[in-house]
């Protein structure tokens, strides 16, 4: 069913839960997994942190021998930039499933802050699995 699964990670607990779901699905369908992290700028600190996040995520996949790709996507600052960078990565890599974590924001906080996951739904044609925090 799914052959190319992309998981967006940012080092948060909910991203770890999304990664676990992505690994499980990739293992079930013998799919290739692409782990993507958005970096916000040209500075080395952002790139180094992005690489650390990806390497940590990759170590989680090595245990199950899931074929994995790592990708740092450069994003403009702000939620739109992150969603745009992930959407571009989805199209470039031709992912057929995207797995992302989503917070449980409600009310005014959700209105003002928004959601990368929400924006992805509007930007991509691939299936999206939203993983809520437990």
Task: State the predicted function of each range.
Residues 3-49, 53, 58-66:
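Small/aliphatic-rich secondary-structure junction motif
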Residues 36, 67-71, 129:
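General small-molecule cofactor/ligand-binding pocket signal
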Residues 38-40, 73, 133:
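Active-site loop/turn elements of alpha/beta-hydrolase fold enzymes
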Residues 49-53, 81-86, 113-117:
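Charged helix-capping and loop-helix junction motifs
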Residues 63-98:
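Structural beta-alpha unit
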Residues 90-134:
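Gly/Ser-rich helix-loop-strand patches that form or flank binding pockets
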